[in-house]
Amino acid sequence: MFAHTLFRKRCAIWLLAIGIFLMLGSCAEKPSELERIKEEGVLRVITRNSPSTYFQDRNGEAGFEYELVKRFASTLGVELQIETADNIDDIFSRLNRPGGPALAAAGLVASEGRQELARFTRSYLDVTTQVVYHSGQRRPTSPKDLIGKRILVLKGSSQAEKLASLQVEYPELRYDESDAVEVVDLLRMVDEGQIDLTLVESNEMSMNQVYFSNIRAGFDVGEQNSLAWVVAKGEDDSLLKAADAFLEQAQQNGTLQRLRERYYGHVDVLGYVGAYAFAKHLQQRLPRYEKAFRETAKEHGIDWRLLAAIGYQESHWQPEATSKTGVRGLMMLTLRTANAMGVTNRLDPVQSIQGGGKYLVQVHASLPESIEEPDRTWFALAAYNVGGGHLEDARKLAEAEGLDPNKWLDVKQMLPRLSQKQWYSKTRYGYARGGEPVHFVANIRRYYDILTWVTQPQMEGQQLAKSELHIPGINSTDLMEELPPL
């Protein structure tokens, strides 16, 4: 009897222990969003397909948002998986859907109206909303000037929110929204006169303005806006905190500054007149020499559009160009460089292009191994213009100032000092017109961007007759920028 009672007590204790164990197991906290991402090894991100956010070219994936969020995924130790949304509303819908992407990195304004849809990280870029109009029309300077105009903006955008707010004060104001277009389409429609006005953020206007010779910025609407990443609504803030910490570190360690320089640091160098002239020369001059650019680039393993951009900066693709200093030809080679590259006739455009391509590759290869891409390409262009010795002087000046001698963003600040006695007197190679290579590189980067946009990715070596140029505003097929591999 005693043994039976003891057995029953032990069974009760075991059952109680099992119950407590099961209860604790059921009450155990689920892994946080951040822990789940790390366990799965993948960060799923939704974005927009546009030149300021994310795009794919022959070199792979690129874009300001893409590069920034890729670095974030790397700090988490996970792979990045990109999804593209059909429109802005689609971003928020999929973000809040069970099993949807964890983060949106799409150049989104952290507007008041969107706070109800999701949660925003700290800002990583400040922009303003600009009214864009056709240069042939009167410039709008205030909200009153929007009344009676054909206005189209992205559906669900912060620009639509601002127009809705203006409508309260100006009931006569009318506008349309569309989820079937992107920013580039809106700018093209203004450029072609299909609509009178649109509203876009200043960073997208700056990046795209050079492709459309007829668009201008009228006035800013409202206060400055903050671009931020977005996570779904909820109480789990683990991913949000991790993203905030990353963006703060990116601001402190220069990552954001370098990305801004890469994608926005050279966007305003041409101006309206320069952009129009370049578009005209694309159609009238480049076709004569495109085959030579392509063949030379293929021989040396470089992007033909980079070589063509150098040619335009040097001579505007004029084979008989001559400067006061004696440099001649389409690639404006000095006699010394021409001889070294085996060029016997600098006025022969094919020889000039071949010599310029060969020289660029040699300059690129001669740079210190510590300089990595994309900076290495910009350094090579600067050395192509001012010479390797002067470039090395500027690198040493940068190092002396506590800057990074391997970053173009830092060294380009030092190059203009080579024309100032207090600085060049301390260098090995002395005086140089140091401001010139800075402008040289900036211009070539912009020409290269445009060439990348307006040419379809084709197999190198195709016949010139099969090549097609697509000028934004004339044709509808546009490409995004890519960095030139050397």
UniProtKB/Swiss-Prot annotation:
Q: Mind telling me which residue stretches traverse the membrane in this protein?
A: none
- Protein name, UniProt field: Membrane-bound lytic murein transglycosylase F
Q: Where in the cell is it found?
A: Cell outer membrane
Domain of life where this protein originates = Bacteria
What PANTHER family does the database record attribute to this sequence? MEMBRANE-BOUND LYTIC MUREIN TRANSGLYCOSYLASE F (PTHR35936:SF32)
Q: Which SUPFAM superfamilies match?
A: Lysozyme-like, Periplasmic binding protein-like II
Name the encoding gene, please.
mltF
Non-LT domain: annotated segments: 29-267
The GO cellular component terms are: cell outer membrane
* Molecular-function annotations in GO: peptidoglycan lytic transglycosylase activity
The stretch of residues making up the signal peptide is 1-28
Q: Name one GO biological process term.
A: peptidoglycan catabolic process
Instruction: State the Pfam families in the record.
Output: SBP_bac_3, SLT
Q: Where is this region: LT domain?
A: 268-486
Q: What is known of its domains?
A: The N-terminal domain does not have lytic activity and probably modulates enzymatic activity. The C-terminal domain is the catalytic active domain.
Protein's membrane topology:
Peripheral membrane protein
Q: Which UniProt keywords apply?
A: Cell outer membrane, Cell wall biogenesis/degradation, Lyase, Membrane, Signal
Family matches, as CDD domains: MLTF-like, PBP2_YfhD_N
Reactions that this protein is recorded to catalyse: Exolytic cleavage of the (1->4)-beta-glycosidic linkage between N-acetylmuramic acid (MurNAc) and N-acetylglucosamine (GlcNAc) residues in peptidoglycan, from either the reducing or the non-reducing ends of the peptidoglycan chains, with concomitant formation of a 1,6-anhydrobond in the MurNAc residue
Q: What EC identifiers does the entry list?
A: 4.2.2.n1
Which residues are named in the active-site annotation?
314
